[in-house]
Amino acid sequence: MANSPIVGQYVQAGTDKVMSCDQKLLADTVRIPLSFFTEKLEIVKLDSRDEALVGQTGVTISDNYILVHGRRPNPFKLFDRRGNFLTNIGAIGQGPGEYQMVYDAKLDEANNRIYILPWNASQLLVYDLQGNVLDPIPLCLRCPKAKFNVDLTGGKVSIVLLPFKGSAAVAWTQDLKGNRLGYMEPGHLEAPQDFSNEVISGFNIPGTFDVNILCIMPTRVDSLYRYDGDNSRLIPTFTLNFANTDKIPWHGYGEWPHHFIGDFSEPPVEVAPGSWTNGKTFHYIVDKKTGKGSFFKLYNDYFGNLEIDYPSYAFSNGYYIRNIEPGNLMTDIENALKNQKISDDMRKKLTDLQASIDENDNNYVMIAKLKP
């Protein structure tokens, strides 16, 4: 990115400095290897016992554990980092410690806790790493869609939710018994009651609760924030100045340790009466120090230089993670081997992996930790 133009600069917004990027200045596309951002890549084969089988769902990683998210009929499942199945976490259902549709989850290895937040939740479900159901944490407001952080040592829970019209708060901090300690009213962040809208948090920087309230219906000018629970503030950090403010595209923002990243789409296309999909999506990256930026593509140079889809969403909770079924992994290897430019070492690595895969295997998980 050293040769990329300056596309953004910091501007003062009250007491805060916000990186303001100009959409019109984004031009060239750079291809960046995954190794530029991460330390190394592990490929973990998950335990293939019947009780360990998982779908191609979300995954949360810690130093020693892999938490595969639940999706009917499978509950959340906990593995060690070698892929050994340890236990189910909760169950699908409506009873104590059970859940159906889940919006967010956290794996807190240091405190022997797993937290699960269902859609439209009035409580945060709590488990230990042995699979035991613990007392839930009552929430002082119901959460249609929300992201959260738990400070168990400090006895605090921070929540940022999708603030539908009439919501008392967009963000708040409470204790573990549900008593509110501080909150922030929605104000201009209030969103229409449409479940197409989202709350996005990457949690890719230790100690930072980044938040993008993603409004699709309708779109609007907005910012990336950090939630400061101690002072009940959403602090703006980044925004994109759109070339045409009359037609704001679908878009999102995020941040990594040294970069802001984002995406925007061409106008939505109606694929069926009342059913819309976004047009072509563009992903961009901006250096936090220099303001230099460009459109970008991310490719997995640990794995045959295959391009990574949706690069601005490549990392979560400090990791690149891909949960992939064995058949899809075989297809990826076949596609990578078609590239005549990969090294002999890479070709051997891929063919050795290819030979070890059985179609009846459980899923494989690619894991690469973000550099600080």
Please annotate each region the language model reported.
Residues 54-58, 100-105, 142-151, 193-204, ...:
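Repeated scaffold domains used in trafficking and secretory/extracellular systems
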Residues 49-51, 90-98, 138-145, 187-192, ...:
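Short coil/turn segments at the loop-to-beta-strand junctions that recur within blades
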Residues 19-20, 64-71, 112-118, 155-165, ...:
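Short beta-strand elements that form the blades of beta-propeller/WD-repeat-like
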Residues 235-252, 288-317, 330:
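Conserved blade-ending motifs and adjacent loop-strand segments that build the rim/top face
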